[in-house]
């Protein structure tokens, strides 16, 4: 309604300027004109606030503890829970990768019906020794909430800027990517109890710790702390894997 009234006033004023319309001062809605000043002022304030939310362009790699999924007791396919353990630890929750492995939801690699497990429901297959695939954001988010409650946010489906914003706030981010942090061409189609999904055995999970204009830094549960990887390739791989991300606020 305010927008409509604003347009009407602008049309009237335009008529005054271009067609010489005569308007008596008593016919002008002075309070409304004053309200227009407030709208403009509020708009300027909002713009200033939004500009403060813009990315700085970099975030120095955080000192997040590194856990190796291959350390005993080994989790051959346990990159997701190992990365979650790093993020939880940074937020102040003392938990091991193997504890999380025992707590995360699981589903079979292959059902008796021939259907495949859905990583959106739980870890698919055998995490410790294989064969297995992995687990996606939803079960990880649910598991993280049992520790950190409302401090956990699922950023899945948002733009990469949402991840970088969290890094600038000092929060490492759990993500799904690929093993070499570049898009892959070996995607497979699986029929699951929930329908058809696209998967790859090249799926991998890491804890993102920082970024700049060229690189993304991450704790790789294969044993690399603040590993530097090409930002453009990483973003493409992350998007290919469904833009999955979970963060725990400090």
From Swiss-Prot:
Pfam name, any one: Peptidase_C39_2
Superkingdom, natural source: Bacteria
Keywords: Signal
Position of the signal peptide: 1-25
UniProt keyword Ligase, yes or no: no
Name of this chain's protein: Uncharacterized protein YvpB
